[in-house]
Amino acid sequence: MVLSPADKTNVKAAWDKVGGHAGDYGAEALERMFLSFPTTKTYFPHFSDLSHGSAQVKAHGKKVGDALNNAVGHMDDLPTALSALSDLHAHKLRVDPVNFKLLSHCLLVTLACHHPAEFTPAVHASLDKFLANVSTVLVSKYR
């Protein structure tokens, strides 16, 4: 899905609002995903604690946030920016591709909860397209 110039502007503006909270929002989205889609927990057998506030979930949330910061900064070349992450998830972790869509949805909900005034239909659509592109790149090495 091609991001229009307006989409890119919306994504950058929304992500600017996230600021230094990307890791916190990543952790919150993971917690939301674990609660809403419990089968996703199976990809984290090495985590001893998946509860709210878990240090392991916070650490992984920071990784998610950092990856999204990188993606926002490289919207015009996501395949290159996310290549190593795609390899990791496809070949080592073997995460079911549907889980990227689930996490994307949970991230949208998290952003809407924290920034309701800024989460307009246009921003929602742009973020959804952006996260769909990120998901597509992350599953590209599965083939």
Curated annotation (Swiss-Prot):
One of its GO terms (cellular component) is hemoglobin complex. GO terms for biological process: hydrogen peroxide catabolic process. The modification Phosphoserine is found at residues 4, 36, 51, 104, 126, 140. GO terms for molecular function: haptoglobin binding; heme binding; iron ion binding; organic acid binding; oxygen binding; oxygen carrier activity; peroxidase activity. The modification Phosphotyrosine is found at residue 25. Residues 2-143 form the Globin domain. The modification N6-succinyllysine is found at residues 8, 12, 17, 41. The keyword Iron applies. The modification N6-acetyllysine is found at residue 17. CDD domains: Hb-alpha-like. Keywords: Acetylation, Heme, Iron, Metal-binding, Oxygen transport, Phosphoprotein, Transport. Belongs to the globin family. Heterotetramer of two alpha chains and two beta chains. This is Hemoglobin subunit alpha.
